[in-house]
Amino acid sequence: MEAETKTLPLENASILSEGSLQEGHRLWIGNLDPKITEYHLLRLLQKFGTVKQFDFLFHKSGALEGQPRGYCFVNFETKQEAEQAIQCLNGKLALSKKLVVRWAHAQVKRYDHNKNDKILPISLEPSSSTEPAQSNLSVTAKIKAIEAKLKMMAENPDAEYPAAPVYSYFKPPDKKRTTPYSRTAWKSRR
């Protein structure tokens, strides 16, 4: 009860108020030091309650392949445990960096018409809430509209704008060589 009467820093209070809109108990933890291990972070999170799921992300390819991405996701058993983790961990120093702890937001991926236009979450990242809403047209409908326009343009060419002449990049030489290239010809010109 004493923890409930405690005043929260303004930033943590606004983060916790966002939690009322969340359905799950999933948190995004960012600004992780590259030296922090999955094991140590999991041990730190278990102090706040039962961890149902923990996703520590690594680079899959490129120059940083196998190295941590600098953020992770954690699901707690209850909302109270998640809120306590936000209160205690947000802004705390972990190795050389201050942790950023937020409620995770579902990122939505739209599939094409052949897959029944299902809208499914592909991951939970904080950036997804800032993306503008996409139009309701499916990708296949847009492709079909563009193909129809191209077909119409091919059938009814515009006389006002003639087609550009085709340039041949591999133009055959005017003269065919009878002998192979020789450097001695360059030396004799000097």
Curated annotation (Swiss-Prot):
Record's keyword annotation contains Nucleus: no
Annotated GO CC locations: cytosol; intercellular bridge; nucleoplasm
Domain named RRM: residues: 25-106
Keyword Membrane appears in the UniProt entry: no
Pfam family membership, one: RRM_1
UniProt cross-references to PROSITE patterns, sorted A to Z: RRM
Alphabetized PANTHER family for the sequence: HETEROGENEOUS NUCLEAR RIBONUCLEOPROTEIN
Protein name stated in the entry: Probable RNA-binding protein 18
Organism listed in the record: Bos taurus (Bovine)
